[in-house]
Amino acid sequence: MKNKSQYQLNPLTKAFAAALPVVMMATCVPSAQANTLFIQNHWVRDYLDFGQNKGVFKPGAVGVTIQRKDGTSFKLPDLPLPDFSVAEVHGAAASLGNGYGLTVRHNNLTGGSIARPQYGHSIYQKVDHMLVNGGKEDIAYLRYNKFVVESTGYGEGANFNLSHEQALDRYGTDYQGKRRILIYRVGNGSVNLVKDDKKHGFLGAYNRDFQSAGIYELRGNWGSGDFDDIVGSSFVNEVTSGDSGSISLVYDNYQKKWVVFGTTAFLVGNNYNTWYRATKFDNAAMQQFKDKWSKNVALNGGTLSFNEKADAYQINGNAEVAFRGDKDQTKNTNDKDLIFTGGGTLRVNRDLDLGSGGLIFADDKKYTVDSYGFDQEGPFSVSGAGINAGAGSVVDWNVSGVKGKNMHQIGTGTVNYNRKQNNQLRIGNGTAVLNAERTFDLVYLANGLGTVKLGHEKALNEDGNMNNLIFTERGGTLDVNGHSLSFKRIATNIHLGIIKL
């Protein structure tokens, strides 16, 4: 691979370069590089499949080997591949799970794909963000109006309090004869192609069809945030203008999972070369942000009811506890996620709108959400960011939804929808049991981890040719549970869903 500083930017590339800052370490200014795919030995498709988890690059796959153009083999590190569905489709932000996201501060935080991010085929809205150290750190934590169903997200960061030796043990990998800390990154920066030492401008930034990924190694000591291409590797995807906010990950050998290294922020240079810098993920800052947007509720088998304004609750008739703040300077109400533990009942005696707040039900307990009485059209409704049903938990949902306000379900637990909801279900994980006639107007399965089980012979909306059932972004499983079902067409994206009889 050639020294990156020898490639000169053409006028189009220079225009894109303004989107990614360059930190100069010397007076001699090197050229900032674009998202450059080295195609002397590898096909463009390999980089795209890697970044989109297609073909052999499935999440969790280990020991992946691909063929170079000359017929020789290139073996990826012996690490389970990350799930790159965390990337927003334009690449400038990433999901951290539930209703949280991550980007850099210098991106436009009030417009574009940061204010209205898209994951899969769902468009979300940013309702808040938090800067770190008075905005001196080039990182921003995001709060969305709904739980993201297209990805489980990566919500934990690496530990930057470790020494370099400790980090090498915890996050290091033996690769090509050397112990290294490898960093995996996915983004949608502007695309250049390099072949025969010539660079060709190809495509502008933020094209969802050209999401690509690369493998890098830590540069310098742990904690610097710096990383670079692996010397001598043929599979090279240089960071580009337009890659600001793209997520970078490291593998935690202790926890056997991927954690966030940071968000890609800068090109850094000296007289001889350029490399990359991520703003390090701050676990304490993220927890502070979550604390602002969540409320722990020890239900412990009790019965909870909400007050008339839906800004406070009481358990078993005891004193009210406030959980929603006043509107702030952005005019957004502090709509907290309610995190329930211990099992129990939520009693709803009026239509309840939680805004951007969701309901999180902790593991291995039974919960019931009841409509206490009925209005003229049926049970009272509940709307908000969605439901997160924890592992082993079961939620009996005996209320209705609100037309135009979709239900987003995540978590590995089970939700029994026992009433007609009048809206759409978007499920990314866990099991949804549809026990009412036409339980939802439309069902959208994403991420490949969710199961929709039919508990009623007419649970789906049978208007049209496709039963208003969509498999998208890795799809999911439809368990017909012994019921008869006929399709004229099945709506699916690239990855097919599974129909279980």
List each model region and its residues.
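Glycine- and acidic-residue-biased ligand/ion/polar-headgroup-sensing regions
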Residues: G413, R426-N435, A446-G450
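Conserved catalytic-core segment of clan PA serine endopeptidases
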Residues: F38-F50, G111-Y171, K195
